[in-house]
């Protein structure tokens, strides 16, 4: 059971607001490494044990107190201490997530802002998660927005930040990476080390650690995660949860709550909402960008491709997370499948009757043939990979289209215990990898594009077969 403990004093900010008219409208502030999120503080109420305050507990003896009579004084002390005992509220967020499972994003957003006030903020990446800001605006409640400026964002994203601030009349609170850490990384490995040894180290310096500092000043945060963004890693995101990775203002495990108002919303519905509400959007979207991150690690995707294919495209599908939402990555999915531990757990893909299924021996024999009578096109795939799943329809269509043409269309499952073989012998870099074995040639040619529609694959075949 996921629970969060919220400790509140009997002297609450709500009481002060209603009785004395003190405005609790949140202050927009810089939440850099030198200053955390501004908070409204309520002066602590000190205990008065002098006996001069009137006690709510009547003395046991109505006669005047004497020097030797300590019972009334003890009763007074107990009563006054009792007045200041803090109330501990235990929230079951698993149960709350169930109650809100079918709620609208607006209802979830309103609940989050109502519950946490100035202690919650929206994490804004500069993409379609601007929908979160629109939902917060529609609640009529004050809200805060922060963003991670990695120093490597697209110029279009910076201009978009400015447009959002002007549209909503807000100030986005930017978090920056530690300059010493960035200098150390760049001087030791260069500006583009992530192309060589993966993006995790760079993301840790430029994104994860700045985020950790920002969240230390909050009790909750709001993200734009959706289940359909990455079926392999985000398919079980709840609408609200105790953050399994980061700590909040009070410190310790369970001190931060994570809200995901659009977890159950599909990407198309988000865009319909943005168009209907005439919300400003990042101009990169019009250029084919869907998932937007840092400039060196983001590119446009083509029709039919999954949106996350535009991020860290040189890495395996299972690596397409930067670490900000590590707690939502399914721990037992990809790793087990890659190691061949759960082959039967995922249904196979590419099921056209005109498609040849190759075994390890079959593809080894195909590689040995130096004078093939017909060309082959083979996809190296893993059925759990969302990018392989995304091209299933087009590849099956290709097999049906080429049936009887003299071109063989085949598949080879290259995960699990076949992965190392595929890396060494078949040029496997990430899933899916497509190879063409030309006629009268033993060396396969790797398809270089991520455009996997029927027309593009057919055109490539005609050029190299």
UniProtKB/Swiss-Prot annotation:
InterPro entries given in the database record: PAPS/APS_Rdtase, PAPS_reduct_dom, Rossmann-like_a/b/a_fold, Thioredoxin-indep_APS_Rdtase, Thioredoxin-like_sf, Thioredoxin_domain
Entry's Gene Ontology molecular function annotations: 4 iron, 4 sulfur cluster binding; adenylyl-sulfate reductase (glutathione) activity; adenylyl-sulfate reductase activity; metal ion binding; phosphoadenylyl-sulfate reductase (thioredoxin) activity
Q: Does the keyword Oxidoreductase apply?
A: yes
Query: Is 4Fe-4S one of the keywords?
Result: yes
Residue pairs linked by disulfide bridges in the UniProt entry:
385-388
State how the cofactor is bound. Binds 1 [4Fe-4S] cluster.
Q: How is its activity regulated?
A: Stimulated by sodium sulfate > ammonium sulfate and is sensitive to inactivation by 5'AMP.
Q: Which GO terms describe its biological process?
A: cysteine biosynthetic process; sulfate assimilation; sulfate assimilation, phosphoadenylyl sulfate reduction by phosphoadenylyl-sulfate reductase (thioredoxin)
Transit peptide range is 1-53
- The residues covered by the Thioredoxin domain are 344-465
What is any one of the record's Gene Ontology cellular component terms? chloroplast stroma
Q: What induces it?
A: Induced by sulfate starvation. Induced by cadmium.
- UniProt entry keywords in alphabetical sequence: 4Fe-4S, Amino-acid biosynthesis, Chloroplast, Cysteine biosynthesis, Disulfide bond, Iron, Iron-sulfur, Metal-binding, Oxidoreductase, Plastid, Redox-active center, Stress response, Transit peptide
Q: Which domain of life is it from?
A: Eukaryota
| CDD domains the UniProt entry points to | PAPS_reductase, PDI_a_APS_reductase
Q: Which reaction does it catalyse?
A: glutathione disulfide + sulfite + AMP + 2 H(+) = adenosine 5'-phosphosulfate + 2 glutathione
- Where is this protein primarily located? plastid
- Region described as Reductase domain: spans on this chain: 73-327
Per its UniProt record, what Gene3D superfamilies does this chain match? Glutaredoxin, HUPs
- Note the pH dependence of activity: Optimum pH is 8.5.
Instruction: Give the subcellular location.
Output: Plastid, Chloroplast
Q: What is its EC number?
A: 1.8.4.9
How does the entry describe the domains?
The C-terminal domain may function as glutaredoxin and mediates the interaction of the enzyme with glutathione (GSH). Active in GSH-dependent reduction of hydroxyethyldisulfide, cystine, dehydroascorbate, insulin disulfides and ribonucleotide reductase.
- Main role? Reduces sulfate for Cys biosynthesis. Substrate preference is adenosine-5'-phosphosulfate (APS) >> 3'-phosphoadenosine-5'-phosphosulfate (PAPS). Uses glutathione or DTT as source of protons.
Tell me the protein family, please. Answer: Belongs to the APS reductase family.
Q: What is this protein called?
A: 5'-adenylylsulfate reductase 1, chloroplastic
Taxonomic lineage: Eukaryota, Viridiplantae, Streptophyta, Embryophyta, Tracheophyta
């Amino acid at each position: 059971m996921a629970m969060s403990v919220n400790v509140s004093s009997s002297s609450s900010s709500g009481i002060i607001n209603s009785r004395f008219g003190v405005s609790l409208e949140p202050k927009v502030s810089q939440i850099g490494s030198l200053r955390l999120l501004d908070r409204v503080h309520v002066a602590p109420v000190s205990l008065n044990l002098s006996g001069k305050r009137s006690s709510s507990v009547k003395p046991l003896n109505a006669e005047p107190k004497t020097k030797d009579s300590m019972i009334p004084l003890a009763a007074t002390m107990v009563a006054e201490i009792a007045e200041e005992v803090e109330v501990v509220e235990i929230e079951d967020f698993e149960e709350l997530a169930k109650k809100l499972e079918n709620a609208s994003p607006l209802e979830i957003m309103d609940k989050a802002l109502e519950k946490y006030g100035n202690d919650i903020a929206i994490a804004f990446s500069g993409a379609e998660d601007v929908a979160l800001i629109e939902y917060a605006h529609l609640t009529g409640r004050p809200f805060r927005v922060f963003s991670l400026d990695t120093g490597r964002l697209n110029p279009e994203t910076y201009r978009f930040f400015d447009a959002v601030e002007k549209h909503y009349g807000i100030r986005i609170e930017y978090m920056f990476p530690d300059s010493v850490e960035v200098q150390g990384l760049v001087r030791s490995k260069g500006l583009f080390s992530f192309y060589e040894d993966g993006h995790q180290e760079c993301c840790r310096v430029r994104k994860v650690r700045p985020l950790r500092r920002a969240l230390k000043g909050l009790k909750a945060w709001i993200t734009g995660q959706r289940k359909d963004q990455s079926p392999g890693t985000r398919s079980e995101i709840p609408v609200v949860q105790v953050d399994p990775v980061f700590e909040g203002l009070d410190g310790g495990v369970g001190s931060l709550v994570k809200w995901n108002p659009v977890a159950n919303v599909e990407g198309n519905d988000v865009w319909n909402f943005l168009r209907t509400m005439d919300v400003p959007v990042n101009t990169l979207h019009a250029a084919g960008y869907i998932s937007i991150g840092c400039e060196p690690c983001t590119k446009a995707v083509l029709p039919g491709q999954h949106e996350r294919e535009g991020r860290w495209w040189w890495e395996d599908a299972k690596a397409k997370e930067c670490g900000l939402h590590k707690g939502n990555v399914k721990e037992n999915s990809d790793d087990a499948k890659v190691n061949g531990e759960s082959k039967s757990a995922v249904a196979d893909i590419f099921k056209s009757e005109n498609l040849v299924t190759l075994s390890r021996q079959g593809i080894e024999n195909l590689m040995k043939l130096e004078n093939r009578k017909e060309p082959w096109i083979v996809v190296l795939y893993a059925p759990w990979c969302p990018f392989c799943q995304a091209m299933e329809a087009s590849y099956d269509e290709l097999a049906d289209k080429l049936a009887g043409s003299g071109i063989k269309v085949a598949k080879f499952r290259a995960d699990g215990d076949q992965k190392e073989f595929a890396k060494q012998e078949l040029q496997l870099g990430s899933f899916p990898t497509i190879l063409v074995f030309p006629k009268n040639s033993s060396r396969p040619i790797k398809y270089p594009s991520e455009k996997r529609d029927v027309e593009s694959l057919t055109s490539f075949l005609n050029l190299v077969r």
